[in-house]
Amino acid sequence: MNSHFLTNDLILEVLSRLPLKSVARFHCVSKRWASMFGSPYFKELFLTRSSAKPRLLFAIVQNGVWRFFSSPRLEKSSSTLVATAEFHMKLSPNNLRIYHDNTPRYFSIGYASGLIYLYGDRYEATPLICNPNTGRYTILPKCYTYRKAFSFFGFDPIDKQYKALSMIYPSGPGHSKILTFGDGDMNWKKIKYRVLHDIYSQGICINGVLYYLGDTSDWDNDHDVTSGNVLVCFDLRSESFTFIGLECGQLINYKGKLAVIFWDDVDDDDVKDDAIDEMHVWVLEDVEKKEWSKYAYTWTEDKLYRSQVSVVGMTASGEIVFSMRKYTSEQPFYVYYFNPERNNLRRVEIQGFEAFTKFGTVYTFVDHVEDLNVYNLKHFKSVHPPSVQPEYDESDSESEEDREIII
């Protein structure tokens, strides 16, 4: 049937259900279709469809080379015990290697509204933003710092702007800076803050606020500033800081609110091999009033080992998601869904990594959506067409860390 006999609304309704890669191809069909796909109405419709079915995003790094996969996020009504991951891309433009490290001082990774931010662990490393679905990327301007700064990434949903935050060492020279991505010439600009603090965690962005863990106890701040471990809240729109006293834990998105996971017997910085079957969850209900809701959960099936899994978030239906930290083709890779209402734990095997990589460290994100607003961002370049055939880089030598087997 000729498309001229179909209404625009019907065409848009059908096409909004397609994957991002397919929509991108249809841009070339005609000027009419290109115009429709570029309209704010279709972009919002497509994002609404994608947000209704968020996916798990897996970023696997092996010797500085990153590969991205995604799989359906299985809700609690699903009885499926196996899910297949779709391979999206291998990120290695011009043989660039982005090395990772478990310490946020040396390596930063962030996810915000469809984009991944990486700042590698090496001298002269540069920050990079990429779209894990399409392979488009940009390398941000270098930001001079004493040694290497802590770095974070987030999205302001009101002004619809992505921002990268670079925080210097409190005792070092220079200035903390922020960069707005997507418009203009992408220059870093100075930001002011009065509270000196050490930084202890990666950041997480929720509804335009960046959160990370820090410590003010070693610095001479004003008397009204909490001394000790703190939750740092940075509003991306106003570019202002708030500090809340809080012990160290693990930060997750809890149905659109910031939550902190605590284990019953260990400090979060001290990852043990002991099996765990209990956790405490604090949900930040009000930032200004510093009010928390507190929950404690236990389970009996499939005891987990903190050295092998991490909490990565919560689904819209209220299940807390755990993911394995390491992948090896010699054994299955699992994601766990914990239902607080029933106190039960589901284990789902993720298949599909083995065709593209043998081993690696895995970073998992719970609420990955495809957003057309990030498809044609001004500064993005194209990586070589994403490989869709199974491939190994036999020249990559296995490091001692990557050789760890998870039981």
From Swiss-Prot:
Q: Where is this region: Disordered?
A: 385-407
By what name is this protein known?
Putative F-box protein At2g16220
- Return the PANTHER family for the record: BNAA05G37150D PROTEIN-RELATED (PTHR31111), F-BOX ASSOCIATED UBIQUITINATION EFFECTOR FAMILY PROTEIN (PTHR31111:SF130)
Positions of the F-box domain: 1-45
Q: So which domain of life are we looking at?
A: Eukaryota
Please note every region of biased composition (Acidic residues). 391-407
Q: Name one GO biological process term.
A: response to arsenic-containing substance
Signal sequence span is none
